[in-house]
Amino acid sequence: HMGEQARKETYLANDDVIDGWEFTATLDGKTSITCASLDGNKYPLNTGPLPKLHWNCRSVAVPKVNPEYDLGSEIIGERASINGPVAANRTYGGWLKDQNKSVRIEVLGEERAKLFDSGKLSIGKFTDKSGKIYTLPELKKLNPQLLHHSSTLRFQ
C-alpha cells in the first residue's frame, strides 16, 4: 500500500509529464475478480480505484505519459503472464478467454464462468466502477438480457 501511495504522489508531482494511469493486474489464475475486471482501465490522475485493493493484491498503477512527452509508447511491448510473455496491450479478459475452462472457473466461479464463456458478460461487468463484486442476483437484476438464459444459470 505504501508503495502505491508513493507512486501516486510521484505521478501527481509530475502531472506535466504524466496525465493518467492504467490499472494493470497480474495475468494468472490467482487474480481476484476485482482486479481482473479493472485491468486495462485508464484513469486521469487522482481518480479511479488505486491498487492495492485487497490483501495480497499484485496489481499496479502504470503511469501514462502525456502525448507531448511520449517517446515511443506506440511500440507494443510485452507483458508477463503465467504462460509466458503476451502483448502489453492484452487485458485480463482477453487473456482469460484463451485459458482452459478450469482456469476460468477458478477465477470467476462456475456461474460467472458460464456467463463469461457465453459472451453475455465481459469480465468488466462483474464489478462496479470501484471494483466491488456484484452478487449473482445483482448481475441478473443489472443485466436483464440474462433472464433469457437463466434456465442454465443459478442466480442464488
Question: Where is each model-derived feature located?
Answer:
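Domain-core detector
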Residues: 1-54, 63-156
